[in-house]
Amino acid sequence: MSIAAGLARPPRCVLVNVLTGEAMECLFNPTQLVEKLQVNWNRLAVPGLSHQVLQFQGTSNRQLAGVEFYLDAFFATQQADASNIMAFRGFLRALTVPPAGTEGVLATAPPRVLVLWPGLLTVECVVASVEFHYRQLAVDGRVLVYTATVTFEEVLDTRVTSEQLRQEVP
């Protein structure tokens, strides 16, 4: 292994606004990921039967719950792109409201986001919630360190079968 390869940063999580194509690479990969699904069943009560009959209703949308993004202004200035950490905040906030000029019920929704997690998953989602915690502030009030905790919910436009999911390999 060369020294350059040893010093190279690993691939990072990328968020892409599906509507505009704008991509935002995470400063750090979140340290953990919770992928949540729920299988929904109707519970049918049959008189005289000792148990409830379960009837499959559907599966909830996959959620990536509580994904925590850590942003540090000092670390960001050391990077080649020298990004402003508040740009990530603006990017996330823009994913929570409809874009300008949208009309009609279907179009009046926040844009979808593509979550690309290298070697693990690629999911088209919407932002279900976002919470910002400002951890360190400068004397002049600038934010130096903050976390953004985001819950993403998958959006599916087609029916998914168990065979398709079984073949899914990152």
Task: Please name every model-derived segment.
Residues 1-170:
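Acidic, Ser/Thr- and Gly-enriched intrinsically disordered low-complexity segments
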